[in-house]
């Protein structure tokens, strides 16, 4: 009986930890790397739009940006590397924007 309670509590804890990651999902972009624009160009464009970029990197073939959006939200955002189209913006596991 005690083993079942411990197992149930452990599984509930794991589910709670995994929820934020599942909420945003994994973004993937499939564009030939030869057509990509530079990350510095994306950062410059975002800064002109009022973003504060702390860090950017490539993740899943997309550009992933960590920073503050123009509304002051500290966010993680994904952009298409060729078009710079905004694909997903999330804050602490909560989706603020997702391209349809």
Name each region found by the language model.
Residues 18-20:
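N-terminal signal peptide c-region/cleavage motif recognized by signal peptidases
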Residues 51-58, 63:
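Surface-exposed patches in mature extracellular/periplasmic domains of secreted proteins
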Residues 27-53:
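Short, non-transmembrane alpha-helical segments in secretory-pathway proteins
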Residues 22-24:
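Boundary of Sec targeting at the N-terminus
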Residues 84-100:
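A short, surface-exposed interaction/processing loop segment used at functional sites
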């Amino acid at each position: 009986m005690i083993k079942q309670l411990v197992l149930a509590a452990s599984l509930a804890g794991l589910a709670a930890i995994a929820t934020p990651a599942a909420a945003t999902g994994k973004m993937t972009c499939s564009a030939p790397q030869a057509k990509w624009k530079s990350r510095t160009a994306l950062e410059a464009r975002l800064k002109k739009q009022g973003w504060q970029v702390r860090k950017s990197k490539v993740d899943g073939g997309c550009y992933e940006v960590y920073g503050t959006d123009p509304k002051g939200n500290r966010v993680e955002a994904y952009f298409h590397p060729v078009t710079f189209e905004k694909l997903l913006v999330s804050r602490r596991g909560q989706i603020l924007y997702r391209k349809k």
